[in-house]
Regions:
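Flexible, acidic/Gly-rich N-terminal and inter-domain linker regions that tether
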Residues: 1-105
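Conserved Radical SAM active-site core
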Residues: 92-214
Length: 215
């Protein structure tokens, strides 16, 4: 599956605000798009009932809402853990895992297809590095499970960047994804709900600790 359309989850609120100005739309339309994506969890342009029909058509024409294709699902014996294998738009494979623990619903998400770190104990490390995921591809992993949980009356409570790849080796996209998921007017997951796992890239760790992020 390939498409020239940008993945809508790659865009931040400021980009939507600029786009609405270019399209001659009032600025609040950007807020409605943002709310639709991250609060309502809508997965197609047609679902954006707060937008006029013409604007929904523009969104559908200009953006892709699907960057992940489900390839395989695996479940633990108790059904509390679900692993999903996805194919990206260029057919690279990644994994995302949902873990249900008591009141928590934790997602383990992927930041790279493959990994360049080469850890001998890690299956992903033995694959070699394929490519970085975009911020939108990281975000979409969360939104897909958020929609599934919402249908069960539940929400994502925690996100761990502990899937395939080294998050700090894909720093910009990983941080952009966290900022998008933590945005107060968007998905609004607090910073303490995120965990970033790293093999220990010291310059990136220093950068991460020096940056001010929402608590």
């Amino acid at each position: 599956m390939t498409t020239d359309k940008p993945l809508i989850y790659d865009w931040d609120l400021a980009q939507f605000q600029a786009l609405m100005a270019d399209w001659g739309q009032p600025s609040y339309r950007a807020d409605q798009i943002w709310d639709g994506l991250y609060q309502q969890l809508w997965a197609s342009a047609e679902e954006f009932s707060t937008l006029p029909k013409g604007l929904r058509a523009h969104l559908d024409e200009h953006f892709s809402f699907v960057g992940l294709r489900l390839s395989k699902q695996l479940y633990s014996s108790d059904g509390q853990t679900e692993k999903r294998l996805y194919l990206l738009r260029d057919d690279q494979a990644i994994e995302t895992v949902l873990m249900r623990y008591d009141e928590r619903r934790t997602l383990c998400i992927t930041t790279q297809a493959g990994c360049a770190m080469g850890c001998t104990f890690c299956a992903t490390g033995q694959m070699g590095f394929r490519r970085n995921l975009s911020s939108g591809e990281i975000v979409e992993q969360v939104l897909v499970f958020a929609r599934l949980l919402a249908a069960e009356g539940e929400t994502v409570t925690n996100v761990v960047l502990m899937g395939m790849g080294e998050p700090f080796h894909n720093y910009e996209a990983s941080m952009a994804a966290l900022d998008r998921l933590g945005h107060a007017e968007g998905f609004n997951l607090g910073a303490r709900r995120f965990t970033v796992s790293t093999v220990g890239l010291i310059p990136a760790i220093q950068r991460f600790t020096s940056e001010q992020r929402k608590e």
